[in-house]
Amino acid sequence: MTHSLRLPLLAGAALLASGLAAGAQEVNLYTHREPGLIKPILDRFTAETGVKVNLVFAGSGLAERIQSEGDRSPADLLLSVDVSTLTQAVALGITQPIVTPALEKAVPKTLRAADGSWVAVSARARVIYASKDRVKDPALTYEDLANPRFKGKVCTRPGTHAYNTGLISAAIAHMGPEKAEAWLKGVRANLAKKPSGGDRDVAKDIAAGICDVGVANMYYVGLMNKDANQKAWVDAIRVIMPTFQNGGTHMNMSGLVLTKHARNKAEAVRLAEWLVSPAAQELYAANNFEYPVVEGVAVEPFIAGFGKPKADNVSLDDVAKNRKAASELVEKVGYDLGPQS
């Protein structure tokens, strides 16, 4: 899939070059979010405000790219899929605070940085997909993924992916490093195959009988359900809203940082504020099946039918702080090598 993303990146760079030369009212957005998920929302922003959004997409490495571009970087905002990516951008020194009364009013304190360095625009739950036919448990915890009764029955995408390092970061916060290592070793021992693909592949593999359970983001259930070629995968699974034994459901988010050298700061702030408006939050929920970050905006009905996530007592800041340790743990236990023979 990676090779197919080069064209949007090059096209985005060309848009930036032409837009900057023209001096039009615009904002330059670097993003790790798939264009198909975010572009319809950005098009609505442009239609309502007249501000053009120049989009540059890459699967990873955009914070480092902005750093290398220095004060010549055209990027005004970085929109990413994981809190740790945003805190990494802050650590690289490429951001400035994004604090306004509108953002503070709309977004709860738990979903924005205390120092104003980042702000969430949507939230997602890391849930368990389970076979309807082969798994009868009404509830499961994340710890259950390491239970020997699931040996040879677990599927996940690679542990190095941000969605899984986020979950592992939360596990470290809940269990401590030693118990988290034992847990991840247990999950590896239960793998049905070498981690590969994405979250949709977890549902696909369960439907094919390759595995019985796996972890994936909730919103993919909604996306697959409206895809005629993938709906059968959804029909084969139950969605279980898991918790940690002494905590809640792991929630991560997609969010924004304002770049240090933003040339279109006013437009960037305008976009950030618009993304947390009720209208934009409703679009996020309806189009992307994510959880709104703004109180009072309804969860998409299909997703709401799977139940409400239990609030976790581990903050996103704690998840971000454990990111390096989580990545090292994935490597240490050899998770992405797959099940041991």
Outline where the language-model segments fall:
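Short helix-loop capping/hinge motifs at secondary-structure junctions, enriched
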Residues: 133-140, 173-181, 262-268
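Conserved C-terminal helix/tail region of periplasmic/extracytoplasmic solute-binding proteins
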Residues: 312-341
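Mature extracytoplasmic/periplasmic domains
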Residues: 254-313
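Early extracytoplasmic/lumenal segment of secretory-pathway proteins
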Residues: 25-87
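Short beta-strand->loop
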Residues: 30-33, 114-115, 130-132, 137, ...
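Ligand-binding pocket segment of bilobal, Venus flytrap-like solute-binding proteins
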Residues: 163, 170, 175-242
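Periplasmic solute-binding protein
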Residues: 83-94, 113-140, 168-169, 251-257
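A structural signal for short loop-to-beta-strand junctions that line the ligand-binding cleft
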Residues: 73-78, 96-128, 143, 153-156
